[in-house]
């Protein structure tokens, strides 16, 4: 016997047609797959809002020629060492670097780390992506 649970929902025709167009454009094979992802995303938002355990990545680009920027980035990462699983550093060109920081911990702490990095002069772009850690 499967652990799957089947249920029915009632939706307006316009809403389900719009949903079907959306999920087709996203490449979903079925409504069930799309609904599972929507439910997971909503549960992740709840976990994040409640300060729960999450994992994710901070992806940033920066100008490594900016005075003291690299030292500040390293100092901040050391301040949050308990959240950082690993980092990957990529030289994009002579001036620009890409850094990917894998993180795991309580959502508010990871958001503090992300914010501390984002506001540094020389950081051109930073994006935080979180997922469930359980």
From Swiss-Prot:
Binds 1 nickel ion per subunit. GO terms for biological process: response to nickel cation. Ni(2+) binds at residues 78, 89, 91, 97. Keywords: DNA-binding, Metal-binding, Nickel, Transcription, Transcription regulation. Gene3D superfamilies: ACT-like. Chain A, domain 2 (3.30.70.1150), Met repressor-like (1.10.1220.10). Belongs to the transcriptional regulatory CopG/NikR family. This is Putative nickel-responsive regulator. It comes from Chlorobaculum parvum (strain DSM 263 / NCIMB 8327).
């Amino acid at each position: 016997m499967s652990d799957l649970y089947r249920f029915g929902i009632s939706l307006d025709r316009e809403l389900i047609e719009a949903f079907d167009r959306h999920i087709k454009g996203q490449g979903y094979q079925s409504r069930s797959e799309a609904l599972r992802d929507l439910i997971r995303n909503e549960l992740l938002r709840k976990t994040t809002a409640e300060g729960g355990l999450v994992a994710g990545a901070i992806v940033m680009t920066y100008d490594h020629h900016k005075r003291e920027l690299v030292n500040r980035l390293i100092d901040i990462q050391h301040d949050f060492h308990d959240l950082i699983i690993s980092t990957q550093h990529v030289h994009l060109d002579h001036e620009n670097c890409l850094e990917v920081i894998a993180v795991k911990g309580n959502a508010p702490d990871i958001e503090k780390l992300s914010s501390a990095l984002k506001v540094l002069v020389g950081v051109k772009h930073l994006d935080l992506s979180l997922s469930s850690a359980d």
